[in-house]
Amino acid sequence: ASLGTAFTSQHAGVLKRYTDQVILTYDSDGAGIKAALRAIPILRDAGISARVLNMKPYKDPDEFIKNMGADAFKERIAQAKNSFLFEIDVLKRNYQLEDPEQKTKFYQETAKKLLQFGEPLERDNYIQAVSREQMIKEEELRQLVNRLGMQMGLKAGDSYREDASGRNVISRENGSGP
């Protein structure tokens, strides 16, 4: 267990020795959400798949278990959300989707995040999942992702992401940078 603000790539390296999957159970408040958002890319870079546990309406695991019991907590663990889809849900909170302009910006940012998957099959799986959850036509989202990738100069198999300091990082299929 780590505190969210203290989670590092070294922690992820230790975890990787024991598992390829983790469930993040940070507090459900703003600080906990930020901690999860910081931990997700660190875990991803270490090759660890993460899911995020929804504690609501309670603040933390202790409060949840005291009020709902261990069986309910186990159910929540089984329902933990894929970390990328969690990131999209959090991103969505920044937009007023009733406004067409805001909705378009949300879809553009979502498409940009989908570019982090260089493997075409994985990217396609996430396009399908996001289109289902966010109620956007799959083909329209795919076209938006492809168009954005072309504008950024990505080739098939390349991936794009922002690093922890906000810099754009392009990973080429052969493992080299831009």
What positions do the PLM features span?
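Short hydrophobic/aromatic-enriched beta-strand-loop microsegments
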Residues: 1-4
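A charged alpha-helical hairpin associated with nucleic-acid processing machineries
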Residues: 6-178
